Amino acid sequence: MNRRQAILKACLLLRRQDKEESLAKFLLMYMLDETTEQFSNKLSEELLIEQENRYFDLINKNINEDTPLSHLVGFDYFYDRKFKVTKDVLSPRMETEELIYKVLEYIKKSKKDSFRILDLCTGSGIIAITLKKEIVKKYTEIVASDISEKALSIAIENADNNNANITFIKSDLFDNISGKFDLIISNPPYISYKDKITIKDSVLNYDPHLALFAEEDGIYFYRKIIENAVHYLSKDGVIFFEIGYDQKEKIFELGKNNNFITTVYKDINDRDRIAKLIYDK
């Protein structure tokens, strides 16, 4: 069976179960670890029997267990870079790319020549690694922390694979962090436990709950970071968060209560998603 035939057969299987047919192509491309261009030029190439068997095993796993693509193949792409994904870290989200974009936009406009950056709740390390690779015209020192040793091991592996020099620290937020930072960035757990029933099984069953849910209606980590950030921000330092679509007012309130001026930006779906907080001395 060649690649095109395998994809057509997989599409039929997915269609019968009312699944997204585009998964058929992307799953085979990811499994073979090829770029879109490489893959498109080899559609008539025969699959090895081992490849064919593995491919349809993965297709059936998605159908029967609703396993996400990234967990089927063990990696995902973020900002055009490849990152290892396991059950111990979140799969990369498109919304987080928008957080990266806003941070890069801020850095580009800044008159500073160097930045010391702290990435709290780093998970797989995608934020820290992407910033290290994308900021090329200014010097950066990046520290990334997480409370999960398993997540940190994945982040370290991802940094090595992407040739990104980052300091990783096991820490519950600021507990083991020292020094001042020009930027504090975080995409912390922010889903309220009461919203758990609204979350898709493909997320609940495969993403770590430690990285998804937070107390205080999802605000706990934002509150802890905002209340303590002044001790870790350098002069004119800034905080960037990814936030839940319904958390804007709570972030504004937390910012105001701790002398921060808050700006919230919408994502591509016109939902409140990125918060920027500047300390109002």
What is the predicted role of each segment?
Residues 30-106:
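Conserved AdoMet
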Residues 1-47:
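Non-catalytic accessory regions of SAM-dependent methyltransferases
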Residues 7, 24-25, 55-56, 69, ...:
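A general structural signal for well-ordered alpha-helical segments in protein cores
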Residues 27, 66, 96, 127, ...:
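Residue-level signal for inorganic ion chemistry
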Residues 97-198, 224:
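Conserved SAM/SAH cofactor-binding pocket of Class I
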Residues 14, 107, 159, 229, ...:
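Conserved hydrophobic residues forming the short capping helix/wall of the S-adenosyl-L-methionine
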Residues 190-220:
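Mobile active-site "lid"/loop adjacent to the S-adenosyl-L-methionine
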Residues 84, 216-278:
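Conserved Class I SAM-dependent methyltransferase catalytic core
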